[in-house]
Amino acid sequence: MQYLFIFLGGAVGALLRYLLSFINTSFEMPIGTFIANLCGAFLMGFLGTLAIQYFNNSPMLKKGITTGFIGSLTTFSTFQFELVQFFESGSFILLIVYALTSYIFGILLCFLGVRLGAKIS
């Protein structure tokens, strides 16, 4: 049954990730991937913290949200591939800006998610 929750959460996260990828064509920097990863970082902190409090008796739902939905929404491999593309095209400034903003804001948003989740629970 746990696999079903992961599958359903994954389907929703993957669809949202796919829809966000359309934003990538409008900017020099892959904004869709950036948004997906930052939202995922915040949600992992927020929902991960809430899951400890509210979903502790439902590990299937917790896995569906974290592993399924957030896992398929975020995309570390696409992020790495985009960094390599910047490198190969000689766009070193974009590479550095994209990497640093993704990591720094990702950590900050995850931290904020944890703090907000702790306040609510």
Curated annotation (Swiss-Prot):
Q: Has keyword ATP-binding?
A: no
Give an example GO molecular function. Answer: metal ion binding
Q: Which InterPro entries match?
A: FluC
Q: How does it sit in the membrane?
A: Multi-pass membrane protein
Show the GO cellular component annotation of the record.
plasma membrane
Where are the membrane-spanning stretches? 3-23, 31-51, 64-84, 92-112
| Compartment(s) where it occurs, according to its Swiss-Prot or TrEMBL record | Cell membrane
Q: Which UniProt keywords apply?
A: Cell membrane, Ion channel, Ion transport, Membrane, Metal-binding, Sodium, Transmembrane, Transmembrane helix, Transport
Q: Where is this protein chiefly located?
A: membrane
Q: What does this protein do?
A: Fluoride-specific ion channel. Important for reducing fluoride concentration in the cell, thus reducing its toxicity.
Pfam families named among the record's database cross-references:
CRCB (PF02537)
Q: Which family does it belong to?
A: Belongs to the fluoride channel Fluc/FEX (TC 1.A.43) family.
Please name the source species: Staphylococcus saprophyticus subsp. saprophyticus (strain ATCC 15305 / DSM 20229 / NCIMB 8711 / NCTC 7292 / S-41)
Query: Reaction(s) catalyzed by this protein?
Result: fluoride(in) = fluoride(out)
- Annotated S-S bridges: none
The residues forming a coiled coil are: none
A GO BP term, please? Answer: cellular detoxification of fluoride
Family annotation (HAMAP family): FluC (MF_00454)
Q: How is its activity regulated?
A: Na(+) is not transported, but it plays an essential structural role and its presence is essential for fluoride channel function.
Annotated positions binding Na(+): G71, T74
Task: Identify the coding gene.
Answer: fluC2
Spell out the protein name for this chain.
Fluoride-specific ion channel FluC 2
Query: Can you tell which superkingdom this protein's organism belongs to?
Result: Bacteria
Signal peptide residues are none
